[in-house]
Design a protein with these regions (language model features):
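Tandem repeat scaffolds
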Residues: 1-152
Length: 152
């Protein structure tokens, strides 16, 4: 399906299943998604301003490419086979989320909160990671990628 020239403002989507959707010239303003499934969604042509929150959602095969998503909320979400590429996520909150085969490429993750996440793997050579909060496991992966061995 293709949504074109649509605008949703102050909408709340609960227990929705949104699959195989392309968003062209699409606006989300102060929208909340709770307990939703988003699968096969291409958000590359979303319009701005764009403000939304996702709480306890499943995201599968969702591409966030060349987007400005500062201060977005992704609480307790499950990301599977997702891509964040050239996306500005500064000050976004991913607390309690799980990442499985999900990549961040050339994205700004400055001041993001990844507390209590699982499966997070961020390459510091291709992402901006200034002042981020990450779990110890993710920190060790970053150090290992940089050639730093932590041991006693």
């Amino acid at each position: 399906f293709n949504f074109r020239d649509c605008e949703f403002e102050k909408c709340r989507f609960v227990n929705c299943s949104i699959k195989n959707l392309k968003l062209n010239f699409f606006k989300l303003i102060d929208c909340e998604f709770k307990d939703c499934l988003l699968q096969g969604v291409n958000a590359a042509d979303i319009m701005f301003p764009c403000t939304f929150s996702l709480v306890n959602c499943d995201l599968r095969f969702v591409d966030f490419i060349s987007l400005r998503l500062q201060k977005s909320i992704f609480l307790s979400c499950r990301f599977r086979d997702c891509l964040f590429e050239e996306t500005d996520l500064r000050k976004s909150d991913f607390t309690g989320s799980e990442f499985n085969n999900t990549e961040f490429r050339h994205s700004d993750l400055s001041h993001c909160d990844f507390s209590m996440t699982e499966g997070l793997d961020i390459n510091p050579e291709i992402n901006r990671i200034l002042s981020i909060k990450i779990p110890q496991e993710a920190g060790l992966k970053i150090l290992k990628r940089m050639g730093v061995v932590v041991g006693g």
